[in-house]
Design a protein with these regions (language model features):
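Conserved helicase RecA-like core
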Residues: 1-168
């Protein structure tokens, strides 16, 4: 579990940098249905395979979306907390809390989507200056220290790109 200190107006750029390094099997949690669609659109425009999961989507379409994620047809899911409970997709290696979860239960259920059944996984929490005290409260209530993560710089991103080119 890590947190990324980022101002609200830099969140999308920070997210894109993180996804340059890790973009397969990702759930990005946001607070509103509107943000699920606008963020997914921005990520699609950046070349990512993305789907949306929120309360406005009919159950059969949600199940289809989860199935596509499981099979690798999509790599990134932008979701409201409707997806937090009960979702078990082996491919999920990264959970990003794009919007801060203000209670321990929501946080626990969100990050529980990765690293299930002994698998490895990572959770990143975006925090702005107004949310720093909530971060400390979250650490206290979960009794876990959440370490700070730096936004990936160009060198790290380029090394990852080179590694992908070499492996292909």
């Amino acid at each position: 579990q890590k947190f990324l200190y980022v101002q609200r107006h830099h969140k999308l750029d920070a997210l894109k940098r993180i996804l340059e390094i890790n973009n397969e099997g990702v759930i990005i949690f946001v607070r509103t249905k509107l943000l699920t669609t606008s963020l997914a659109e921005a990520l699609e425009n950046a070349g990512h395979s993305v789907a949306v999961l929120n309360g406005d989507i009919p159950q059969n379409q949600r199940e289809n979306t989860v199935d596509r994620l499981k099979k690798g047809f999509i790599n990134i899911l932008v979701a409201t907390d409707v997806a937090a409970r009960g979702l078990d997709v082996e491919r999920i290696k990264l959970v990003i809390n794009y919007d801060f979860p203000f209670d321990k239960e929501t946080y626990t259920h969100r990050i529980g989507r990765t690293g299930r059944a002994g698998r490895s996984g990572e959770a990143i929490l975006f925090v702005n200056h107004r949310e720093k005290h909530f971060l400390r409260n979250l650490e206290n209530s979960t009794r876990n220290k959440i370490e700070e993560l730096e936004i990936p710089n160009n060198k790290i991103i380029n090394e990852k790109r080179m590694g992908k080119l070499i492996s292909n």
